[in-house]
Every structure is written in structure tokens, then in C-alpha cells.
A protein has these predicted regions:
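Bacterial N-terminal signal peptides
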Residues: 6-16
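N-terminal "domain-start" segment that seeds a small globular fold
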Residues: 25-60, 86-90
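Extracytoplasmic
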Residues: 42-44, 64-67, 100-105, 136, ...
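Structural microenvironment flanking redox-active thiols in thiol-disulfide oxidoreductases
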Residues: 85-149
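Extracytoplasmic/lumenal ectodomains and periplasmic regions of secretory and membrane proteins
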Residues: 162-221
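Juxtamembrane/start-of-transmembrane alpha-helix segments at the extracytoplasmic/lumenal side
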Residues: 224-245
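Juxtamembrane interface at the cytosolic side of transmembrane helices
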Residues: 247-267
Length: 267
């Protein structure tokens, strides 16, 4: 079921509405959410944030002359951000490259109300799952002011919207690969990431080069809504299809075993 949702929600997923009805964000709002691919665009290295240890750090200092994966989201995100980071960790675990030795990862919260304490909890969780030495000083979890977050998001081409009714954010899924100089080299979209493509992207960025513009498949995907207790139309169709396939495969497996058993008895 989780895989089916991840396959459908490739690029844009709206966080589930936990406290109110689903009419807080309109279709026009959703159309404005996404990425503007600004390949070659330098990010402002002087922008300052607070890290998970409550230290004020400049974005440029965290690059440390290495390629960097920039993940924009927020730590209290009830669904999408977890899927993005889950997919990222799965891809990273397939690489020979290591966080710290070969590249950095920077998670930045788009919620100005989130604190370094919240960031520290997420950092501990993800470093434990990544489980490779040397990542602690190179995988950063940052929080910032609304002004700083907005500037970074604008420069990165990251379009998101806050819903004051549900107190949540609608935002695109994916992450950005930066060169050691802080220029945008490539975008990755979705929640599942090809380790081979990621390896190539890191290698390309490490040489200061930029990749090409990637086609962004946009699916306005409704997901599980805790208010209605139902899945959205698109997801529901996929889940039904997966269920049918599962039943068919199970039936095929049973028939195959029965035939083998009959053959064995006949022999």
C-alpha cells in the first residue's frame, strides 16, 4: 500500500488536513505549487540559519567545498516529507559515496516556527537510519526566519503555500543537487530516487557542472485523509489495481503449487 502511494504521488502531494475540512486549499493554489528549475542559479551563500545545535550558520559554510543535496520541507510534516527522506535514505544506502566524505546533505525547514530542538530530533532519527560513520558533521538540519526561508525557496525555485486553516504546508516533493560553489546542478522529483542517477548527479555536481532540465510530472494526488478516512480518487484506483494484481498473483501461485503437488503424487 505504501509503495502504491509513493508511485502515484510523484511530484506534488498535499499534506493531509488534520484539523479541518479539505476545502482550505483550492485547485488554483495547487497549480502554483511546484519547482521552477533554475539550473546554474547560485544560491545566496550568506543566508544564515540555526542548526540542530542552536548555532548560527551560513549556507555557504556548510557546503564545505563539496556537492550538496538540499532538501526543503518541514519537520512536523505529517506525510510527504517522511516519504521524501525515506526515499532519499534508501537511495543513499545504495551508494559507494558517503555523506561527509564525498558530499553533504542539508535539510531546511520551510516553517519559521520550527525550532532547533525539533531539527535535532529529526537529525538523530535520520542519522540512525543512515548508519554510516562521518555523517554527523555533514548532514545538517536547519531552521530559519520567514524572510530567510522565503529567499532561499525563491532562489531554489521551490514554490509552496501555507494553509492557515489546517496549519500545514503544501509543497512539491524532491530535492536539489548543488555544486561545491552552491549553484543548482540538478533537481530530483518524487519520493523514489534512482541510486545510479543520484550517483551520476553527485559526480557531475562535484566537478562544478550542471545537469539538464528534468521533466516534472505533476499529479495532483489526493492521499489518505484522516477526516474522511478515505483515499483520494487517484490513489484509490491504484490501490484497487494493486489489490487485483495481488489476488491474481496469489491465485497463480496456488494453482502452480497444486499442479506441482499433483504431478508429484502422480509420479
Amino acid at each position: 500500500m505504501k509503495l502504491a502511494i509513493k508511485l502515484v504521488c510523484l511530484t506534488i502531494v498535499v499534506s493531509p488536513l488534520a484539523q479541518t475540512s479539505a476545502r482550505a486549499l483550492t485547485a488554483d493554489d495547487l497549480k502554483r505549487i511546484g519547482y521552477d528549475q533554475r539550473i546554474g542559479q547560485p544560491l545566496a551563500r550568506h543566508l544564515t540559519f540555526e542548526d540542530s545545535d542552536k548555532r548560527t550558520v551560513a549556507l555557504g559554510d556548510l557546503l564545505n567545498h563539496k556537492p550538496t543535496l538540499l532538501v526543503l520541507g518541514y519537520y512536523h510534516c505529517p506525510m510527504l516529507c517522511s516519504l521524501i527522506n525515506d526515499g532519499l535514505i534508501e537511495a543513499l544506502q545504495e551508494l559507494r559515496f558517503n555523506v561527509g566524505r564525498d558530499f553533504n546533505v542539508i535539510n531546511v525547514s520551510i516553517d519559521p516556527h520550527e525550532t532547533p530542538a525539533v531539527a535535532a530530533v529529526k537529525k538523530k532519527e535520520y542519522l540512525k537510519r543512515y548508519a554510516r560513520p562521518g555523517a554527523d558533521g555533514a548532514w545538517h538540519f536547519l531552521t530559519g526566519t520567514e524572510q530567510t526561508i522565503t529567499q532561499l525557496a525563491n532562489e531554489a525555485g521551490f514554490r509552496f503555500k501555507f494553509d492557515p486553516v489546517s496549519n500545514e504546508y503544501a509543497h512539491p516533493s524532491g530535492f536539489i543537487v548543488l555544486t561545491p560553489e552552491g549553484k543548482i546542478s540538478r533537481y530530483f522529483f518524487g519520493v523514489n530516487f534512482d541510486p545510479k542517477e543520484l550517483r551520476r548527479a553527485i559526480a557531475t555536481a562535484s566537478n562544478g557542472r550542471s545537469g539538464s532540465v528534468i521533466h516534472e510530472l505533476v499529479l495532483l494526488c489526493s492521499h489518505y485523509n484522516p477526516i474522511t478516512g478515505k483515499y483520494g480518487v487517484i490513489v484509490l484506483k491504484v490501490l484497487r489495481a494493486v489489490s487485483v494484481m495481488t489476488v491474481l498473483l496469489l491465485a497463480w501461485w496456488i494453482v502452480t503449487l497444486s499442479r506441482r503437488h499433483s504431478t508429484a503424487e502422480g509420479g
